[in-house]
């Protein structure tokens, strides 16, 4: 994990435990993304703001959130993104949201893939965490130099394919990781 400069931390999303487990693993300030409506809650709003969270409109009007994310990355910050956009319903990795590739290509920040196994401890349908083993695994940074170079010269209609390729490569890197406890 780069200790300085911009970095996107891209992780699968299994439970409410994911942001603190990922964020507490780094020795630098982290910015988070959070559903916009959580900021209007009297309890979660101030808490999320204190964590440098970026409000994201999950209804599709994400241009404002994207602008804030890119600004924070330009200021050499680290930001955690959950490409799936929401927690899994069944513990399996879901497909990523459309804007992730755009964020990756435009930011020019390296992407650190992270795989979490927290579903059994506090999955979507669980109110209280269960004391079971969890795992968090960090991959090597992905730089996307060639995709970013192509994006700078390709015709506009081809950009969507490059964004999708960045998204697919990120999700494949996350899905390919296996927990340490699986090793003999």
Regions found by a protein language model. Give the residues of each.
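Catalytic core of membrane glycerolipid acyltransferases/transacylases, capturing the structured
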Residues: 3-61, 68
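Non-catalytic C-terminal accessory region of glycerolipid acyltransferases
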Residues: 64-184
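Short, Lys/Arg-rich amphipathic segments at extreme N-termini
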Residues: 1-4, 176
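Generic signal for short, ordered secondary-structure residues
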Residues: 1, 26-27, 48, 82-83, ...
């Amino acid at each position: 994990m780069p200790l300085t400069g911009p970095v996107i931390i891209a992780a699968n999303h299994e439970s409410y435990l994911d942001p603190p487990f990922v964020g507490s693993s780094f020795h630098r300030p982290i910015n988070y993304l959070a559903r916009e409506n959580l900021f209007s809650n009297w309890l979660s709003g101030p808490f999320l703001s204190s964590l440098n969270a970026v409000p994201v409109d999950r209804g599709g009007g994400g241009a404002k959130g994207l602008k804030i994310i890119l600004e924070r990355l330009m200021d050499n910050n680290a930001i955690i993104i959950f490409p799936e956009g929401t927690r899994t319903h069944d513990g399996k990795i879901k497909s990523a949201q459309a804007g992730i590739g755009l964020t990756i290509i435009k930011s020019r920040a390296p992407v650190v893939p992270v795989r979490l196994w927290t579903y059994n401890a506090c999955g979507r349908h669980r109110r209280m965490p269960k004391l079971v083993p969890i795992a968090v695994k960090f991959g090597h940074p992905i730089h996307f130099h060639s995709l970013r170079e192509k994006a700078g010269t390709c015709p506009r209609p081809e950009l969507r394919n490059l964004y999708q390729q960045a998204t697919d490569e990120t999700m494949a890197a996350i899905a390919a990781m296996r927990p340490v406890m699986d090793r003999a």
